[in-house]
């Protein structure tokens, strides 16, 4: 439904879902394959804001707009993808407030959890072993936070697990991308003193080119990265929890969870490994991994809809 016309009221109906007054009863939950569209409007809105801030920085040379450009540009695709998962949640039982809370607090908490794990295992070069370690550590860091948020929910579902996982992953991706986009700025100021000592002037246009490239490339690849990897972990936790009929920390070592959790770990490791150098000029490996992860997500969405049908038949 992306290319169909939609009213403001339709968008508002999606954004107000999940409250005590707006959560539908199980009998009214749709069992049809979801047709999300609002995420595309969110994407266009953020893209327009980014374009305007880009003009301020690149056309008019106003540095005051640079922080906004970095933040808006880095958040555009992760947030839009998160909204898509919100639309896919047929239960309509998770509010926008909860989603934003999970995005902000969960995203930042997953960064802290990941850094804590790295402080234990140490950082590695991104060779094959280093990529595997990175995949395990970062996906485990996100999974722990996803588990915590899911443990606070009254009703667990596969589609809800996908949404909570995607929200944590989107926060992780957005803040990480903003950090990468900031690196050229830090390098610029670090080098400016060196250049000044030799009476030379540093060209700021190279810095801006590097920032723009980082934002655009990471945004382009974001749908196949942290958002969907964490979404799979969220669904895996719910599937394992329903099989065990409990939701506690034992899930994190349960074979049902680990069988699915290994998928984002492998995809993440492959993404960071030297294998990514194959066809790097056209981002062949990341694009191929994106296709694979979305096939897995589609399978999980189908499982979630089958769960909806089972539950509604019992009502």
Language-model segments: residues:
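Hydrophobic alpha-helical segments at protein termini of multi-pass membrane proteins
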Residues: 1-315
């Amino acid at each position: 439904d992306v290319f169909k016309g939609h009213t403001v009221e339709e968008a508002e109906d999606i954004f107000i879902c999940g409250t005590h007054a707006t959560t539908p009863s199980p009998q009214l939950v749709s069992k049809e394959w979801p047709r999300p569209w609002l995420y595309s409007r969110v994407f266009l809105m953020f893209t327009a804001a980014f374009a305007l801030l880009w003009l301020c920085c690149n056309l008019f040379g106003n540095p005051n707009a640079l922080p906004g450009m970095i933040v808006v540009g880095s958040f555009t695709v992760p947030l839009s993808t998160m909204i898509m998962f919100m639309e896919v949640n047929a239960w309509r039982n998770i509010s926008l407030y909860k989603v934003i809370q999970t995005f902000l607090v969960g995203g930042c908490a997953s960064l802290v959890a990941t850094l804590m794990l790295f402080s234990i295992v140490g950082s590695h070069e991104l060779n094959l072993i280093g990529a595997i370690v990175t995949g395990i550590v970062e996906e485990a860091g996100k999974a722990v936070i996803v588990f915590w948020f899911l443990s606070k929910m009254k009703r667990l579902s596969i589609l809800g697990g996908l949404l909570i996982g995607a929200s944590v992953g989107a926060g992780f991706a957005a803040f990480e991308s903003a950090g990468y986009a900031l690196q050229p700025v830090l390098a610029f100021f670090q080098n400016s003193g060196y250049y000044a000592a030799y009476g030379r002037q540093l060209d700021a246009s190279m810095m801006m080119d590097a920032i723009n490239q980082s934002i655009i490339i990471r945004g382009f690849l974001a749908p196949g990265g942290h958002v969907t990897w964490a979404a799979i972990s969220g669904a895996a936790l719910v599937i394992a929890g329903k099989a065990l009929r409990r939701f506690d920390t034992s899930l994190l070592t349960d074979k049902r969870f680990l069988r699915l959790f290994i998928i984002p770990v492998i995809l993440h490791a492959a993404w960071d490994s030297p294998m990514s150098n194959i066809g790097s000029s056209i981002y062949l490996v990341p694009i191929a991994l994106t296709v694979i992860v979305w096939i897995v997500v589609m399978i999980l969405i189908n499982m979630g809809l089958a769960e909806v049908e089972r539950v509604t038949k019992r009502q």
